[in-house]
């Protein structure tokens, strides 16, 4: 019967209250499960459903596989809007619920569908229980829904990838002469046994109708249920079906036997029986019978899950009268049920695997479920347990068998099934579409779509075909006997395989283990598996056809990819040589010289026939030559005529590249390399001997020729961009930057001296200089600067803070003489993670001579710097940190002439000055790795002049006096504009020049301020000063409050 709208409304009202009662506990829920820790997932909510531990679900959760992103379909009675399904349930039926009356008019409410859905995908939220795939979504439709909506067809066209069916047709129950039910000694009804031939014949009789029904939207009535399942399977869904609860002697009925009429959908069909908690078939469960080849077992006895019940709002009876009065409410609850209807353990299991293997089809997921099941009863597939109990711990590690007809016992074989000889796996690459054009079409967005690994040992008579642009790593010891084809992407063998391997198109085989035979057909490659170097061992023949490619990666200490076979047939093809650029060389004083090395990259027992067409390094600085030596093929490495600076485009880059080119001087060292090329002991002894002989001796000690790590790292560059990235970081530009910054910032000393002289002469208030009547003064410095980078040099930022102190006095009536000192700290942040700090002490002498309105200030300063530098070197796999501490000095002389032209409105002073600055360091000696630099004592000078105008004006209001000083000037640099430092690598005597950002020939000087005298004791001041040019911008801001008391 159908529940009416009045009862549904009451349910919704109740559910709202029920949800509110849970809110506080759910909001406080914190997930105790941790990645990598299976036991941490077994909280109280987990343990309430014993089937979760029985199928080892915790191992999937510990690897973050929870069914997320997968949708489960359920065909059953109506699924209640239980809190366990909040935000994840979609119903495709008419929205009603199922209930019935007994002879006394008491109502019974149908919650079978709710219980089933909870087992598959109830939420994990700290309350009640949770399903196997607790992060999956659910789409439900009713088995018997006679409304206007065709929920079954909508389900077929939906995103649901696995559909649960916990229903079936019950056989008759035997009765005695009195018409009473006959009960068996175990307490079960005596069901009439289905007969295999009768069951299969029923399916076959309806085959044409089912075929027709499956090719169009499924109608209602007739054989529509079977047509629904067939159509869904043909649309790429996995059909999970309960076997039935009709005693162990019985077999599944016609709906579950559909693959006998349609063997092409068998791989999308999975029948499930019911286990008790001791791994015995429950006494109520139907056995596998003729469906054993597509059946697995799962926990199904006393399974705790979500349910609902009718309750009275008044506390009265739950019957027809109360229903008619609107006194009944649906209450969400939990309860235990038993039977093969608990099949959704497998349905949720499949959803977890669909997240784990997002690229697999439903048929392949079914194969993983079956072949990783734990065998029960008789060895192999049997009539009670089929493939065995599902095991999620093993299933998340990939298939354990590639199934063909030969792997199925004859008594259980479905004619026409398991006809595919190859397990075709498409690792599509991140973001690509899988199963395009079907209802289950989806975009592959997880990491497994680009790289995945299977660690199970795979057996069976089938083979493997790898397609798609991604990489599949096969880690187990595999004994499957079918062929292996690699047609796209990479198949990496970190385990062994007994079958023959063929690669074609854009396929790649990689690895360091054993295969049976090997043939590269065309456009294919062999290389390492991305985990170091090793030998791919071929027990029989290795064949390279024209158009194929053999990829070999080379490294130091004689390490390289290698192929060892009984025989090799080279029918052409290319050898592509690459260098291992993952080696971290900077921490080494020496690296083995690559150029001049010889590698054995192919070794055989019975000889090499033919030749490769060519050997192709993809590097401008390295070339290779093949050497065929009897049973072996070798590879020699030499340097090309191209120089490193041929890829450089700027002068700094060229200078560094030329210096690196000189680092190739070699010398023998006593270090030895252990060059082990032994084959695993499990291989045939004669092949092992062949490989060892080709290497001259296993664990042979060989003298290594030393090379400079930087030089060796440059050999692998392929583009100008790579070289520029390296030369910029190796150049040590930060030292030239600091020298330039010290010269530029010397202006703050001379500006302060001239401002103080103008202040003392009464020509400017100079509020940022605090002075007393005895000629003592102080000034706080704070400025920041920026140098704009160019193609040759990276930019940098500076900041300087400190204090200057001075004392001066009148000299006769028309002059002044003073002395100044101070401390400042300059910080410079360069490009590429370079930092410099300079602690600086200053000493200076200044004075002026006045001739009426004409003033001639002059002075000199001397500065001592203590410089600390730190810079990073990071390019490719190379990383290092270089540090240095050294001393430097800066001296300067300056002179100025200014004419005071004042009137009642404004004071003007045109001026001109000239300054000479000389910087000298005491030598640079970095500490670090191979990229550390050194430099001799060196100096540089600069001469600059400034022409400008100073102006200030003052006026008095009723309450305050305001002064507005300002300055505008044009600065001109003489001589060379480059600021460079000469450096060299520590193991070299060849110096190179590195330029900082050049100074601008011309620039502007700008100063502006305001002084507000609130009264004779309180003065507020604000000022800005800047030197602005195309390449450098220096700025300072000062603000002050003077309060005399």
From Swiss-Prot:
- Mark which residues the record calls propeptide: 646-1045
- Methyltransferase: present as a keyword of the record? no
Signal peptide (from-to): 1-27
A biological process from GO: protein processing
Q: Which UniProt keywords apply?
A: Hydrolase, Protease, Secreted, Serine protease, Signal, Zymogen
Under Gene Ontology molecular function, one entry of this record is: serine-type endopeptidase activity
**Which InterPro entries does the entry link to?**
Autotransporte_beta, Autotransporte_beta_dom_sf, Autotrns_rpt, OM_autotransptr_brl_dom, Pectin_lyase_fold/virulence, Peptidase_S8/S53_dom, Peptidase_S8/S53_dom_sf, Peptidase_S8_His-AS
Q: Pfam families given for it? A: Autotransporter, PATR, Peptidase_S8
Question: Does the keyword field hold Protease?
Answer: yes
Give all residue intervals belonging to the Autotransporter domain. Answer: 769-1045
Where in or outside the cell it occurs: the entry states:
Secreted
Please list the residues that make up the active site.
Answer: 76, 112, 341
Tell me the superkingdom of the source.
Bacteria
GO (cellular component) term, any one = outer membrane
Peptidase S8 domain location, by residue? 49-396
Taking the first listed entry, what is the main subcellular location of this protein, grouped into a coarse class?
secreted
Question: What EC number(s) does its UniProt record assign?
Answer: 3.4.21.-
Q: What class of enzyme is it?
A: hydrolase
Q: Family, per the entry?
A: Belongs to the peptidase S8 family.
The name this protein carries in UniProt is Extracellular serine protease
Q: From which organism does this entry originate?
A: Serratia marcescens
Q: What is the lineage of its organism?
A: Bacteria, Pseudomonadati, Pseudomonadota, Gammaproteobacteria, Enterobacterales
């Amino acid at each position: 019967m159908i529940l009416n709208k009045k009862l549904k409304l009451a349910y919704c009202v109740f559910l709202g209250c029920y949800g509110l009662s849970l809110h506080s506990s759910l909001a406080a829920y914190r997930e105790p499960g941790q990645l990598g820790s299976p036991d941490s997932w077994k909280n109280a909510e987990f343990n309430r459903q014993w089937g979760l531990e029985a199928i080892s679900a915790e191992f999937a959760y510990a690897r973050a596989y929870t069914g997320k992103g997968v949708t489960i379909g359920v065909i059953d009675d109506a699924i209640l809007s239980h809190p366990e399904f909040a935000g994840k349930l979609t119903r495709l039926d008419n929205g009603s619920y199922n209930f019935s009356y007994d002879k006394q008019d008491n109502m019974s409410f149908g919650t079978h569908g709710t219980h089933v859905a909870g087992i598959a995908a109830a939420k994990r939220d700290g309350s009640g229980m949770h399903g196997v795939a607790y992060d999956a979504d659910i789409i439900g439709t009713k088995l018997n829904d006679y409304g206007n909506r065709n929920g079954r067809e909508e389900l077929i066209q939906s995103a649901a990838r696995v559909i649960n069916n916990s229903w079936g047709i019950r056989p008759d129950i035997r009765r005695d002469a009195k018409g009473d039910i006959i009960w068996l000694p175990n307490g079960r009804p005596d069901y009439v046994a289905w007969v295999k031939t009768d069951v299969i014949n029923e399916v076959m009789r309806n085959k044409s109708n089912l075929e027709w029904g499956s090719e169009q939207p499924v109608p209602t009535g007739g054989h529509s249920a079977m047509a629904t399942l067939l159509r869904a399977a043909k649309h790429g869904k996995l059909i999970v079906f309960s076997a039935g609860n009709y005693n162990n002697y019985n077999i599944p009925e016609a709906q579950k036997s559909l693959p006998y009429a349609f063997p092409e959908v068998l791989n999308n069909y999975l029948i499930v029986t019911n286990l008790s908690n001791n791994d015995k078939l429950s006494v109520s469960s139907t056995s596998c019978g003729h469906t054993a080849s597509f059946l697995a077992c799962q926990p199904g006895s006393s399974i705790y899950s979500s349910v609902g019940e009718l309750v009275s709002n008044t506390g009265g009876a739950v019957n027809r009268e109360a229903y008619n009065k609107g006194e009944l409410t649906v209450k969400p609850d939990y309860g235990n049920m038993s039977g093969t209807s608990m099949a959704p353990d497998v349905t949720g299991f499949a959803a977890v695997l669909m997240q784990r293997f997002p690229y697999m089809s439903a048929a392949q997921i079914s194969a993983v479920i079956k072949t990783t099941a734990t065998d029960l009863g008789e060895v192999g597939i049997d009539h009670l347990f089929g493939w065995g109990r599902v095991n999620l711990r093993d299933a998340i590690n990939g298939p354990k068998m590639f199934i063909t007809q030969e792997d199925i016992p004859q008594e259980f074989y479905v004619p026409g099934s398991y006809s595919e000889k190859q397990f075709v796996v498409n690792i599509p690459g991140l973001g690509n579409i899988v199963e395009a054009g079907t209802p289950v079409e989806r975009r592959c967005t997880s990491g497994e779509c680009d790289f995945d690994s299977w660690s199970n040992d795979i057996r069976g008579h089938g083979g493997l075909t790898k397609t798609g642009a991604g990489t599949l790593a096969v880690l187990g010891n595999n004994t499957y006997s079918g062929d292996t084809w690699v047609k796209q992407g990479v198949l990496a063998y970190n385990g062994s395989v007994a079958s023959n391997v063929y690669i074609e198109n854009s396929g790649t085989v990689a690895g360091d283990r054993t295969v049976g035979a090997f043939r590269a057909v065309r456009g294919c490659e062999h290389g390492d598996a991305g985990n170091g170097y090793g030998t791919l061992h071929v027990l029989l023949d290795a064949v390279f056809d024209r158009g194929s490619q053999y990829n070999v990666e080379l490294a130091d200490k004689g390490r390289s990819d290698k192929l060892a076979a009984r025989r090799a047939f080279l029918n052409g093809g290319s050898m592509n040589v690459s260098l291992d650029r993952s080696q971290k060389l900077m921490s080494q004083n020496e690296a083995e010289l690559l150029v001049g090395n010889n590698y054995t990259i192919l070794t055989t027992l019975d000889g090499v026939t033919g030749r490769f067409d060519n050997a192709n390094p993809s590097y401008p600085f390295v070339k290779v030559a093949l050497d065929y030596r009897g049973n072996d093929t070798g590879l020699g490495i030499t340097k090309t005529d191209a120089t490193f600076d041929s890829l450089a485009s700027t002068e700094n880059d060229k200078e560094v590249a030329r210096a690196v080119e000189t680092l190739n001087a070699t010398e023998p060292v006593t270090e030895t390399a252990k060059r082990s090329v032994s084959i695993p002991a499990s291989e045939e002894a004669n092949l092992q001997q062949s490989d060892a002989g080709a290497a001259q001796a296993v664990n042979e000690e060989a003298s290594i020729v030393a090379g400079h790590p930087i030089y060796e790292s440059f050999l692998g560059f392929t583009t100008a961009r790579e070289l520029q990235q390296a030369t910029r970081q190796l150049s040590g530009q930060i030292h030239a930057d600091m020298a330039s910054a010290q010269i530029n910032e010397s202006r703050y000393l001379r500006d302060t001296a001239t401002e103080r002289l103008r202040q003392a002469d009464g020509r400017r208030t100079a509020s940022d200089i605090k002075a007393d009547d005895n000629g003592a003064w102080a000034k706080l410095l704070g400025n920041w600067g920026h140098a704009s980078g160019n193609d040759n040099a990276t930019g940098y930022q500076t900041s300087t803070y400190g204090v200057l102190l001075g004392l001066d006095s009148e000299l006769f009536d028309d002059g002044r003489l003073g002395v100044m000192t101070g401390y400042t700290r300059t910080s410079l942040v360069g490009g590429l993670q370079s930092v410099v700090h300079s602690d600086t002490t200053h000493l200076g002498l200044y004075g002026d001579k006045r001739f009426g309105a004409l003033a001639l200030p002059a002075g000199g300063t001397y500065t001592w710097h203590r410089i600390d530098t730190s810079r990073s070197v990071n390019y490719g796999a190379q990383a290092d940190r270089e540090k240095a501490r050294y001393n430097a000095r800066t001296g300067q002389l300056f002179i100025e002439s200014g004419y005071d032209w004042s009137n009642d409105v404004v004071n003007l002073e045109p001026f001109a000055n000239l300054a000479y600055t000389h910087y000298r360091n005491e030598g640079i000696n970095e500490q670090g790795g191979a990229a550390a630099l050194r430099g001799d004592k060196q100096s540089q000078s600069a001469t600059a002049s400034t022409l400008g105008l100073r102006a200030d004006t003052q006026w008095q209001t009723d309450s305050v006096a305001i002064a507005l000083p300002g300055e505008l000037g044009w600065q001109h640099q003489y001589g060379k504009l480059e600021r460079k430092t000469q450096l060299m690598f520590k193991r070299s005597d060849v110096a190179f020049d590195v330029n900082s950002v050049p100074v601008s020939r011309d620039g502007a000087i700008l100063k502006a301020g305001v002084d507000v005298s609130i009264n004779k004791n309180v003065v507020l001041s604000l000022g800005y000063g800047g030197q602005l040019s195309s390449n450098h911008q220096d700025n300072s801001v000062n603000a002050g409050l003077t309060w005399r008391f």
